[in-house]
């Protein structure tokens, strides 16, 4: 995945391509889910994937049977959650619709829960549940933003935000910012 992402980024940087839109799901004329490959998405997604690769490499000693604190921990579950999390982060970068971002955001929330509560200790379970609740609260911002975007433009395409009147555009962008700020609570230094 890292090689493919970097190769895609190099293709866009080297060939001067503007953007490629791929429709994945639509209802009539309404784009529900799609992907955009442009300079920004092909910069962000490879960064997410490359950092994920480094984290996986760094995690090998912790996930081995030589881990004295947790020698019996099921390692496959960690790698499934982590790989899915990285894939969802790439999906967030490539998504061309707010519905797609919502789907990938929800996937990252479930994976965060699985990774945080990985060792299944009472403290880990409590922290994992808190993370799941926080990400679902954040997702409400995307649900509301999607509704406003669709009501104002008839589409879920992120590019349609520019078609909204200035007041509605501000509301939708603030809702997206709300989602990002809620998700940052799960990062080191956050309160979660």
Predicted regions and their residues:
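Transmembrane helix-loop-helix hairpins at membrane boundaries of multipass inner-membrane proteins
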Residues: 1-80, 152-163
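Catalytic P-loop NTPase motifs of RecA-like helicase/translocase cores
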Residues: 43, 110-111, 140
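Membrane-interfacial loop-to-helix junctions in multi-pass inner-membrane proteins
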Residues: 1, 39, 66-84, 96-102, ...
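Central hydrophobic cores of alpha-helical transmembrane segments in multi-pass inner-membrane proteins
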Residues: 1-10, 47-63, 85-86, 108-118, ...
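MFS-fold secondary transporters
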Residues: 91-93
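Juxtamembrane/interface motifs at transmembrane-helix termini
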Residues: 12-15, 63-67, 113, 121-124, ...
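Juxtamembrane/interfacial segments at transmembrane-helix boundaries in multi-pass membrane proteins
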Residues: 12-34, 100, 107, 139-192
